[in-house]
A protein has these predicted regions:
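Short, low-complexity disordered leader/linker segments with a strong preference
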Residues: 1-36, 339-343
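Short, glycine-/small- and polar/acidic-enriched structural segments
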Residues: 32-178, 183, 190-196, 207-213, ...
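Glycine-rich, flexible loop/turn motifs
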Residues: 49, 58, 119-120, 131, ...
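Short amphipathic alpha-helical segments at helix-loop
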Residues: 137, 227-230, 286
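Pocket-lining segment of extracytoplasmic ligand-binding domains
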Residues: 179-269
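Conserved C-terminal helix/tail region of periplasmic/extracytoplasmic solute-binding proteins
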Residues: 306-343
């Protein structure tokens, strides 16, 4: 049973949208008695990582906190999110960490992570391989687009070699979960890095989970909400409202299974509801109640990145994190109040 996207669903990048990069006093509209500030947000691709942002939007929490955000945009990958942030097409973006870190250290962008997020990743093996020790001398799919997949493939090859599982080679595969699964099941490669809900479909087709990146403290630290540094500095109140709404949305995600599953099935185009339910049940445990950016994990990525991006050498990941908005919410009791409200 495939994790089918609904027919006719398209990824559309509207690069003609106006920039809303303005001061806190700027672009507003009135809705009833409340004045809403109009901004734009987006995420890299359809998948579990975008779940909290879509739950926040669907639950009306951005409006609750004074922001007018149209449906968050699919930006066509992390590089698209970086581009959208830098051009002002969007003001806040959800994405995995490698692309913005690479752009930052190369001097192409100045982005900061404001929260952590969900980005659960696994290595799955083709039918017939049930353990990581069987990957010696085998092939692992490699997309080659410079994104998170590439970083994690290179990372796991090195980590397995350190553990005595040597000779795992990169094998080019097309991007997209469905095509990667096809390559895996057909034997074109022996393993792939994959994320829910596609990993659930792979398991249904006889593939096995052999590595959970949680072992390396990476699953909830590979990305999150990012913005341009100068935008945050010029618009602290807008940023504060966005993060407050997002944190409340993450709480709704963690505590309201039915609502989250419905939203996930809708925005992902998953026709099989059980796949959305399994995705939720797989990602919910361990999801942090306070979504701080994890500096130590970002540092792991930066240090590993030095092999391909020399500019990353000796760079401190703390340069690319601003967690004071999250700390405010925790220190003022807002986050604790969300749990109280569910009792």
């Amino acid at each position: 049973m495939a994790v089918n996207r609904r027919k006719g669903q398209a990824i559309h990048l509207d690069l003609s949208m106006p920039s809303y990069d303005r001061s806190d006093a700027g672009n507003t509209r009135t809705s009833g008695m409340a004045e809403l500030i109009k901004i734009a947000a987006g995420f890299a691709t359809i998948g579990q990582g975008a779940g909290p942002m879509m739950v926040t939007w669907k639950a009306g929490l951005f409006k609750k906190h004074g922001l007018d955000i149209e449906k968050p945009r699919i930006m066509g990958g992390a590089k698209g999110v970086v581009r959208g942030l830098m051009t002002g097409e969007i003001q806040f973006g959800n994405m995995a960490a490698p692309a913005p870190l690479r752009s930052n250290v190369k001097g192409e962008a100045d982005l900061i992570f404001l929260t952590g997020g969900i980005n659960q990743q696994f290595v799955m093996a083709r039918p017939g391989i049930t353990g990581r020790e069987q990957l010696t001398g085998k092939k692992i799919g490699f997309v080659g687009d410079g994104g998170l997949n590439d970083a994690l493939v290179s990372f796991i090859i090195e980590k397995l070699a350190e553990a005595g599982i040597e000779g795992l080679q990169k094998e080019p595969v097309p991007g997209g979960g469905d095509r990667q699964i096809a390559a895996l099941v057909s034997g074109s490669c022996d393993a792939i890095v994959i994320t829910p809900p596609e990993s659930i479909e792979a398991r249904r087709r006889g593939c096995s989970y052999v590595i959970d990146f949680a072992e390396y403290v990476l699953n909830y630290a590979l990305g999150g909400i990012a913005a341009r540094r100068d935008y945050v500095e010029k618009n602290p109140e807008i940023t504060r409202r966005f993060i407050k709404a997002y944190v409340e949305g993450m709480h709704r995600y963690r505590t309201d299974r039915d609502f989250t599953v419905n939203v996930q099935a809708e925005y992902s185009g998953i026709a099989d509801r059980t796949a959305a339910e399994e995705t939720y049940d797989l990602t919910r445990p361990g999801m942090p109640p306070v979504p701080y950016p994890i500096v130590t994990s970002l540092q792991v990525l930066l240090d590993f990145m030095t092999k391909e991006v020399p500019e990353a050498k000796n760079v401190d990941a703390r340069r690319f994190v601003d967690d004071h908005f999250i700390r405010e919410l925790e220190d003022t009791g807002f986050i604790a109040s969300l749990d109280e409200s569910r009792k």
